[in-house]
């Protein structure tokens, strides 16, 4: 039996406000990070951090992540359609505010996102999400650490005892 690949953290980086926090947590746990953006993005020079310029096409960064993510990986994104694709692939997915996307919640989250997009385009709703706060940052850090530990426990337990 082969060992599963180590957990990798994929970051949908174009508008991610918690990249620095991800780098610190990943370094502490020794996890590789793929920082994926449509174009060049600055990342720290560190052997665990990989910068990916996926291209300028529509959803190029999303496609790059979705095509590579595996069960046991972590994806950080605010993009609900990308989150849906990654959850279906078996990855753990967190929004930058720490909110987890799961199989149980992704359908409703996607439906609400589509409804709000339609309402905004018709002019019935204006504005967007509230501003990112220090509390969001703290919640994200706790959620990322909890997710990493949960994956590590799952991988360490014998297959007959594994549970989600």
Curated annotation (Swiss-Prot):
This is UPF0178 protein RPD_2254. Pfam families: DUF188. The lineage of its organism: Bacteria, Pseudomonadati, Pseudomonadota, Alphaproteobacteria, Hyphomicrobiales. It comes from the Bacteria. CDD domains: PIN_YqxD-like (cd18720). NCBIfam families: PRK00124.1 (NF001095). It comes from Rhodopseudomonas palustris (strain BisB5). Belongs to the UPF0178 family.
């Amino acid at each position: 039996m082969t060992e599963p690949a180590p957990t990798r953290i994929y970051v949908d980086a174009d508008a991610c406000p918690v990249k620095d926090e991800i780098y610190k947590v990943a370094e502490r746990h020794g996890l590789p990070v793929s920082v994926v953006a449509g174009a060049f993005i600055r990342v720290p020079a560190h052997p665990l951090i990989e910068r990916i310029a996926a291209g300028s096409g529509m959803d190029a960064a999303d496609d790059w992540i979705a095509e590579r993510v595996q069960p046991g990986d972590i994806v950080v994104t605010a993009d609900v359609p990308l989150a849906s694709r990654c959850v279906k692939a078996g990855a753990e997915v967190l929004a930058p505010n720490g909110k987890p996307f799961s199989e149980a919640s992704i359908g409703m989250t996607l439906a609400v996102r589509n409804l709000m997009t339609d309402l905004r385009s018709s002019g019935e709703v204006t504005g967007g999400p509230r501003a990112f706060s220090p509390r969001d940052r703290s919640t994200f850090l706790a959620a990322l650490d909890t997710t990493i530990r949960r994956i590590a426990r799952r991988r360490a337990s014998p297959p007959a005892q594994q549970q989600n």
